[in-house]
Amino acid sequence: MATYVIGDLQGCLTPLVQLLEQINYHPEQDKLWFAGDLINRGEESLETLRFIKSLGNNATVVLGNHDLHLLAVSHGYGKLKRGDTLAEILTAGDRDDLMDWLRHQPLFHYDEQLNTVMTHAGIPPCWDLQKAQTLAKEVEDKLKSDSVDEFFATMYGNKPNTWSDDLTGLDRLRAITNYLTRMRFCDENSKLDLESKEGINTATKGYAPWFNYPTKVPEDCHIVFGHWAALEGKTQKERIHALDTGCVWGGSLTALRLEDQQRFSTPCSINRKNP
């Protein structure tokens, strides 16, 4: 039995099928983790969502910012952006089933046996493992609730950009969501810079990649995340694994086998909708 963590798909099903063939995936014994952003930009978003849902208990998913964007639009909040490839999902006959399944997925997953935690964007320096899990559950519970519309109505926005335990209500949920699904750079106090999106060397003065600061996550715990294609899969940290390698932009799709930290990748042709 093996567990593979796969980076951002963004609606690229064909490379996923190729990667599963490469790793000789056996559904009766192997498990797949997906680090979020299952859909959007790629031309196979509907097929990708259906495929991952069909994997059932073999798939563990955490939500990314594109997945949350789809959910918000499906609830009547937010607007489709140029380059989005979500219309086919929104008009599909099984749309409601897909959206219900998606909003019941977590933002945080921790496997005690593998001592590995997965979120879409990472874990900010100011949170320990238990705090990250507890805060993620606040958003997860809201997503599953009958009052989810008020969350989607206020989900978009870059503020608050500094964590405080005193945050309450929808501001608190937006901050948690941004840390877990949009974070790249922050300062030593975990204040977010959500404007900078390129590589490590492009940080605004006073900011650095979140994983370059001392972390409260135990030293023996591995962190796997996606979201940041400009890293090209590199963090220079032995236990912090970046898995978004830009599949939808013509890069590659990457899987990390957790049992031995071996990486597998398959090259991708550009598979995005032209803006």
UniProtKB/Swiss-Prot annotation:
Entry-linked InterPro entries: ApaH, Calcineurin-like_PHP_ApaH, Metallo-depent_PP-like
EC number(s) on file: 3.6.1.41
Catalyzed reactions per annotation: P(1),P(4)-bis(5'-adenosyl) tetraphosphate + H2O = 2 ADP + 2 H(+)
Alphabetic keyword roster: Hydrolase
GO molecular function, one term: bis(5'-nucleosyl)-tetraphosphatase (symmetrical) activity
EC primary class: hydrolase
NCBIfam families to which the protein is assigned, alphabetical: apaH, PRK00166.1
HAMAP family: ApaH
Similarity comment: Belongs to the Ap4A hydrolase family.
PANTHER family attached to this UniProt entry: CYTOCHROME C5 (PTHR40942:SF4), PTHR40942
The protein's role, per its UniProt record: Hydrolyzes diadenosine 5',5'''-P1,P4-tetraphosphate to yield ADP.
Protein name: Bis(5'-nucleosyl)-tetraphosphatase, symmetrical
